Amino acid sequence: MANYFIDRPVFAWVLAIIMMLAGGLAIMNLPVAQYPQIAPPTITVSATYPGADAQTVEDSVTQVIEQNMNGLDGLMYMSSTSDAAGNASITLTFETGTSPDIAQVQVQNKLQLAMPSLPEAVQQQGISVDKSSSNILMVAAFISDNGSLNQYDIADYVASNIKDPLSRTAGVGSVQLFGSEYAMRIWLDPQKLNKYNLVPSDVISQIKVQNNQISGGQLGGMPQAADQQLNASIIVQTRLQTPEEFGKILLKVQQDGSQVLLRDVARVELGAEDYSTVARYNGKPAAGIAIKLAAGANALDTSRAVKEELNRLSAYFPASLKTVYPYDTTPFIEISIQEVFKTLVEAIILVFLVMYLFLQNFRATIIPTIAVPVVILGTFAILSAVGFTINTLTMFGMVLAIGLLVDDAIVVVENVERVIAEDKLPPKEATHKSMGQIQRALVGIAVVLSAVFMPMAFMSGATGEIYRQFSITLISSMLLSVFVAMSLTPALCATILKAAPEGGHKPNALFARFNTLFEKSTQHYTDSTRSLLRCTGRYMVVYLLICAGMAVLFLRTPTSFLPEEDQGVFMTTAQLPSGATMVNTTKVLQQVTDYYLTKEKDNVQSVFTVGGFGFSGQGQNNGLAFISLKPWSERVGEENSVTAIIQRAMIALSSINKAVVFPFNLPAVAELGTASGFDMELLDNGNLGHEKLTQARNELLSLAAQSPNQVTGVRPNGLEDTPMFKVNVNAAKAEAMGVALSDINQTISTAFGSSYVNDFLNQGRVKKVYVQAGTPFRMLPDNINQWYVRNASGTMAPLSAYSSTEWTYGSPRLERYNGIPSMEILGEAAAGKSTGDAMKFMADLVAKLPAGVGYSWTGLSYQEALSSNQAPALYAISLVVVFLALAALYESWSIPFSVMLVVPLGVVGALLATDLRGLSNDVYFQVGLLTTIGLSAKNAILIVEFAVEMMQKEGKTPIEAIIEAARMRLRPILMTSLAFILGVLPLVISHGAGSGAQNAVGTGVMGGMFAATVLAIYFVPVFFVVVEHLFARFKKA
């Protein structure tokens, strides 16, 4: 093939230009993302049972739905929560690659089977089935810059005018409002109700009747008389709109003819629909909207669309209302991608300088340099064809590919230059001869490297998706690189290179010194190799010791899934003791805000707090803070990284009295959890009950706290059992007094919970009407005795006459995992430990708990456990495939052994570099290790290929052939290896956005390549001679 293009250079250029054009078009159309769809798709089923406690919700709603979720294609695991607000949420997580649309349809079909078994009140409320991500993409906060709007004014405007347009924006899966729109609040007074012989149900029924939209029909409607001349709509009654109108609702007419109006027994006002959350931005009243991605949506496109929509809506905002973004994960995505692009450019420049140093000829250097954009753009075209995105993983693949793809072109150019100099041939003839010598080596390298990366494409789960991104990117680059090296590169060599002048090229002083030093080094290397081959047994023992060291390093290197990143934002949770009020929670959140805005003012840009809300559940004792940091360029230095800020905050905020305040970083992949570290589900496999499971959980937390050198921040991601005030109704006594149980339940539910009645109109928007006891009549236990229920004879009977009360404990939030009662445990690895170490330690602690208590990993930890199980198989398959590819290529079983024996030399270097830098054996390291395996084999192939050719064509002995081959290939091996090492150097020294991943990829590859080069050039001749002698003896035998 090469000879064809040497004679047709224009054709080679045409193909290269077509590849670049295709790549250019692909880049303009490829979407940009931090990661591909790594996270498995999730479907969430949400239901509400008004007035029910957590246990009732679990028994009558959650379990009923769970038990029908069988036979779903690709379901991995299922988690659910039931809380004291009557909410049930079941999240079903499916295998990566499952269509969210199909999964949603299947879940909806299964839900229909459960519907008849659900309480009627639940069915009336409706059940939603959503396919949005469970994690927050961004938070938009709204503030009044001059204080003219209070938090309820702001929240009502946001709910009425902003929430719905945002929820319809492309890419938005769901929105969560931190605040509430206005509602008509009817605050009942039990004493006045009793005075007029009324109960809450009387109020509710009259509101329903008198606040109603009646369809009155028409005058002159069809069919009509032949001479009908009039047609008009009849308006009978419309919905009420103001507190004054509601206050005039007639409840009853007394015997003396006087009227009892709603305002006589209740206070009527325009209040919030929901008082459960309090939002603040830098301590000022605010409202906020959390945006969650739709399944499969692009984060950058969605964020851009949301901001454009808010910018459009801002033209209609009240004068003082402003939008701020206290939490946004997309700047990190944009900047990290930009950093990798920058790394790509730096790598190309460094590779060019290395090539120029070795080739010392601008014409020769420009040839492999031209190959870089051709192959990279061609790779983008392939990525577009297979449906990939421009993301961190594909860009890392490109950076790794630069060092690999120039290798082929360097091998071609260097050998053509050597033939021109040694054989005194003109460039075209020299190129023909050179390609005949190295064509098989090029094919061999391509086959080996492709064989290394091919098994990665068939791994499963989130890890498999990461591997696939690297695999397709690198294999595409390799194949295109070989194609360019056998088409464009020889064509360029034949047309650009010049014949060697008489006496050879005269290098400048710098190159002359370099050449002198290199020639001495080459001679020393040749002499050393000859010495090594006299005592191969001794060096095979050294090799075995190196392999043993590799095994030790493998065992001691900590494991993890993905490295943590400084994403420019993080969160802080606050949990107060059970029973704490919103007032106390708000004070704690203000202390958190003050700390970040004063003590960390050089690093923190804003703090947005939400009282009453947290990932562990909703409650007055829960709070969450979103902290936005200043740009990375303003936070230079490790002491200003998110990790350092969190460590300082953890110490400082631990001093807050009567609250557990915990700052935490975001996970590497947002959809795989809410916090970094590990995520464990403690399971009640033995059906021990909630109390025993709580005891086991507390024992586990106590054991973990005793080992701060292993794990830290181990905490339950749930709500503690809280005091509950139980009302025991004596049904027999109530029946004897003529009081219906339904009336008792209605009165208690309305007074101490609330009752949604119907809707009213406010500023052209339909809003809700709620009836509830006034604040003074539902604050204390004794308030229960102030309420009366009318009996069958029409007299008022106090609740205290047929009920008793007591204090008890119960959970405000119950959890289940795969249909088993569970409790979620979150935590972090201690300093110097990896998440893999922490997970193993926690598993050992669970083994010490009572029988019947088990565990399972979920979220990011589930994927980490899956990836650690797949890694050994991945390495083994890759090595086997490489061996078979080499055997097929050389039609020999012995030569592949000579090549494969070099692999541990590169692996030990990768492990040593990773260990010395304190990094872990994560997915990026595993990809780097496979790259190292391929590159180690490549260097061996370059030497072995020439040695085999000399043995076959020139009849040399194995020792003579390998010494000469090693001498001839030393320069291209060192050149290509140094080019690769410097190509990944920008990854190794990277800092700022995305540096965690870059360091993880670059460190192992750089260490591995360095070791593979330094050790392999000495050990490959040893391996070749030993294997040849062993196989020669085997044949004789």
Swiss-Prot record:
Location, primary (coarse class): membrane
Topological domains annotated Periplasmic: 29-339, 386-391, 461-473, 556-870, 917-922, 992-1004
Subcellular location: Cell inner membrane
Keyword Phosphoprotein appears in the UniProt entry: no
Molecular function GO terms recorded: bile acid transmembrane transporter activity; efflux transmembrane transporter activity; identical protein binding; xenobiotic transmembrane transporter activity
One Gene Ontology biological process: bile acid and bile salt transport
Residue intervals annotated with topology Cytoplasmic: 1-9, 360-365, 414-441, 497-536, 891-896, 945-972, 1028-1037
Signal peptide coordinates: none
Source organism (scientific name): Escherichia coli (strain K12)
Name this polypeptide is given: Multidrug resistance protein MdtF
Quaternary structure, from the entry: Homotrimer. Part of the tripartite efflux system MdtEF-TolC, which is composed of an inner membrane transporter, MdtF, a membrane fusion protein, MdtE, and an outer membrane component, TolC. The complex forms a large protein conduit and can translocate molecules across both the inner and outer membranes.
Any one Gene Ontology cellular component term annotated for this protein: plasma membrane
Parts of the chain that traverse the membrane: 10-28, 340-359, 366-385, 392-413, 442-460, 474-496, 537-555, 871-890, 897-916, 923-944, 973-991, 1005-1027
Inducing or repressing factors: Induced by EvgA, probably via YdeO.
Membrane topology category: Multi-pass membrane protein
InterPro entries assigned: AcrB_DN_DC_subdom, Acrflvin-R, MdtF-like
Family named by the database record: Belongs to the resistance-nodulation-cell division (RND) (TC 2.A.6) family.
Family annotation (PANTHER family): MULTIDRUG EFFLUX PUMP SUBUNIT ACRB-RELATED, PTHR32063
Alphabetically ordered keywords of this record: Antibiotic resistance, Cell inner membrane, Cell membrane, Membrane, Transmembrane, Transmembrane helix, Transport
Role, per record: Part of the tripartite efflux system MdtEF-TolC, which confers resistance to compounds such as rhodamine 6G, erythromycin, doxorubicin, ethidium bromide, TPP, SDS, deoxycholate, crystal violet and benzalkonium.
